[in-house]
Amino acid sequence: MTRIADLRRDYRRQRLLESDAAEDPIEQFRLWLTDAVNAELPEPNAMTLATVGLDGMPAARLVLLKEVDDRGFVFFTNYRSRKGRELAAHPKAALVFWWAELERQVRIEGNVEQISAAESDAYFQSRPLGSRWGAWASQQSEVLASYAELEARLAAVEAHYGENVPRPEHWGGYRVLPTLIEFWQGRPNRLHDRLCYRRQGDHWQRVRLYP
């Protein structure tokens, strides 16, 4: 078996220069996300979401980005889940996107708000029928005695709602309002390119960071 310490890769794909980067980090993010989609990477909108636990410990998991606009980055979940409870207590989060084939990472920090009920309703109704049933059947993050119990709950939801499934009040979207966005491009000898944007009032300040 290969020693973990011997696993390494040298990055040589391209540079990230100030002259090539957008002044607005949201615009720059859209450009990089488009590159990831066009490269047909698996789950290009997958991101690590880190929250502050109720006990002060950090918690992280993968979720899917579902919208990005000038305000921030939107994802959806059960408000009663662990992350939902953590965001209610500490409405701050960090996101990380990793596109290995492009040798790129984006790191985001910011405050978090729930999106409007109308926005959550619109997205919920766009989901596949099975996913809408699942939002009612799953008591996310609670202890499950057996998978059969979940199947029984799903069958009950199907029988009750059929194809007319409303959005549960405990399910909806969050928007991460970024205060920091950092773009990382892998380079040889671990001398990576890092451009960091920090929110300063109504504009962004961009600096280059040591790798």
Curated annotation (Swiss-Prot):
Keyword Oxidoreductase: yes
Residue sites binding substrate per the record: 8-11, 66, 123, 127, 131, 190-192
A GO BP entry: pyridoxine biosynthetic process
InterPro entries: Pyridox_Oxase, Pyridox_Oxase_CS, Pyridox_Oxase_N, Pyridoxamine_oxidase_dimer_C, Split_barrel_FMN-bd
Reaction(s) catalysed by this chain's protein: pyridoxamine 5'-phosphate + O2 + H2O = pyridoxal 5'-phosphate + H2O2 + NH4(+); pyridoxine 5'-phosphate + O2 = pyridoxal 5'-phosphate + H2O2
EC number: 1.4.3.5
Cofactor(s) annotated in UniProt: FMN
Pathway named in the protein's UniProt entry: Cofactor metabolism; pyridoxal 5'-phosphate salvage; pyridoxal 5'-phosphate from pyridoxamine 5'-phosphate: step 1/1; Cofactor metabolism; pyridoxal 5'-phosphate salvage; pyridoxal 5'-phosphate from pyridoxine 5'-phosphate: step 1/1
Sequence positions that bind FMN: 61-66, 76-77, 82-83, 105, 140-141, 184, 194
Top EC group: oxidoreductase
Lineage: superkingdom: Bacteria
GO molecular function: FMN binding; pyridoxamine phosphate oxidase activity
Cofactor note: Binds 1 FMN per subunit.
Keyword entries, A-Z: Flavoprotein, FMN, Oxidoreductase, Pyridoxine biosynthesis
PROSITE patterns the UniProt entry points to: PYRIDOX_OXIDASE
Subunit structure of this chain's protein: Homodimer.
Record-stated family: Belongs to the pyridoxamine 5'-phosphate oxidase family.
Entry-linked NCBIfam families: pdxH, PRK05679.1
Functional description taken from the UniProt entry: Catalyzes the oxidation of either pyridoxine 5'-phosphate (PNP) or pyridoxamine 5'-phosphate (PMP) into pyridoxal 5'-phosphate (PLP).
HAMAP family referenced in this protein's UniProt entry, alphabetically: PdxH
Protein name: Pyridoxine/pyridoxamine 5'-phosphate oxidase
Taxonomic classification: Bacteria, Bacillati, Cyanobacteriota, Cyanophyceae, Acaryochloridales
